[in-house]
UniProtKB/Swiss-Prot annotation:
It comes from Shewanella amazonensis (strain ATCC BAA-1098 / SB2B). Signal peptide: none annotated. One of its GO terms (biological process) is glycine decarboxylation via glycine cleavage system. This is Aminomethyltransferase. The gene is gcvT. InterPro entries: GCS_T, GCS_T_bac, GCST_C, GCV_T_N, GcvT/YgfZ/DmdA, GcvT/YgfZ_C, TrmE/GcvT_dom1. GO terms for molecular function: aminomethyltransferase activity; transaminase activity. Belongs to the GcvT family. Its EC number is 2.1.2.10. It is an enzyme of class 2 (transferase).
């Protein structure tokens, strides 16, 4: 039996088309994926992300433990509520998961991990926590709703209490605050402003309905995927996994190499990979007809006339731009153009940094 989030009946009320997503029964769309996509880029949309896993890490060694566990350095977090994104790596430098960590105090952190990797993540975190004075607590009683888009914050403000609006006023990106019963964070997976709201399950339906009444469009996994790809954000299991190191997944910026004596898990392997040189993740743009898709081969010839091959990790038609975009893992020598093999012929594509749309506008 597939798991259902606490909002399952609300999805059915809005005529959602439900699909299996890593063992969860989730909405693919509510009628039109394209309309849902545009709602987030132009107005406000919301997603049920209650399948995500919230884990609280507490104890005297919480800071030391997370500095060992994660490739990014949570010691950078000194203001309560500040968050950072990064990878949890294995000893070979492969990405076990990408996650967000919120700093609540030196002895209390909140980590949000992907649903598809929940059991693996919890087992790994528990194993690595041995020898540290920490308590790892999964919070399955919490649901999560992401409200995203240029009007998302204004529409959410009509639903929040006075206390909650005061708490989020002027909150910068990548912060989270507990305000009443809600943990409200300025994070997201769309390239737009907005909130990810962690809410007790008992209150989730009422919050969802209040946002609906405020004119927020419910959006499914289909729009979530085209939005995150336009924003150049990785999907775990597709753009990276345990066989891929963060340098080859456009996550190099999330590795805190300094201080040099912080021995995070995977550091030694990653230093060797860095010294040798790694593949990289790039963006591809194809303005002619057709759609770039996952697993299509990518070819280019380097300055010495040698042909190299890579592969598309994620590809789609971009509703915002009106043509196809993709992310591809390729050897580092790639130039400004490449060729993609589709329908037994090669088509020329532009190669750019993997970010296509930010705040509703073309980003390249």
């Amino acid at each position: 039996m597939a798991n259902k989030t606490v909002l399952f009946s609300k999805h059915l009320e809005s005529n959602a088309k439900m699909v299996d997503f890593h063992g969860w029964n989730m909405p693919l769309n509510y009628g039109s994926q394209i309309e849902e996509h545009h709602a987030v880029r132009r107005d406000a949309g919301m997603f049920d992300v209650s399948h995500m896993t919230v884990v609280d890490v507490e104890g005297a060694d919480a800071r030391a433990f997370l500095r060992k566990l994660l490739a990014n350095d949570i010691a950078k977090l000194t203001v309560p509520g500040k968050a950072l994104y990064g990878g949890m790596l294995n000893h070979d430098g492969g990405v076990i998961d990408d996650l967000i960590t919120y700093y609540l105090s030196d002895t209390q952190y909140r980590v949000v991990v992907n649903s598809a990797t929940r059991e693996k993540d919890l087992a790994w975190i528990g194993e690595q926590a041995k020898g540290f004075d920490v308590t790892i607590t999964e919070r399955p009683e919490l649901a999560m709703i992401a409200v995203q888009g240029p009007n998302a914050k204004a529409k959410a403000a009509t639903v929040f209490t006075a206390e909650q609006n005061a708490a989020v006023e002027g909150m910068k990106p990548f912060f989270g605050k507990q305000a009443g019963s809600l943990f409200i964070a300025t994070t997201g997976y769309t390239g737009e402003a907005g909130y990810e709201i962690i809410v007790p399950e008992a209150e989730a339906e009422a919050l969802w309905q209040a946002l609906l009444d405020a004119g927020v469009q419910p959006c499914g996994l289909g729009a979530r995927d085209t939005l995150r790809l336009e924003a150049g954000m990785n999907l775990y299991g597709q753009d990276m996994d345990e066989s891929v190191n963060p340098l080859a997944a456009n996550m190099g910026w999330t590795i805190a190499w300094e201080p040099a004596d912080r021995d995070f898990i995977g550091r030694e392997a990653l230093e060797a990979i860095k010294a040798k040189g790694s593949d990289k993740l790039v963006g591809l743009v194809m303005e002619e007809k057709g759609v770039l898709r996952h697993d299509m081969p990518v070819f280019f010839t380097d300055a010495n006339g040698v042909e190299h091959q890579g592969v598309i990790t994620s590809g789609t038609f971009s509703p915002t731009l009106g043509y196809s975009i993709a992310m591809a893992r390729v050897p580092g020598a790639i130039g400004e153009t490449a060729e993609v093999e589709m329908r037994k012929k090669r088509v020329t594509v532009r190669v750019i940094a993997p970010s296509f749309v930010r705040n509703g506008k073309q980003a390249f």
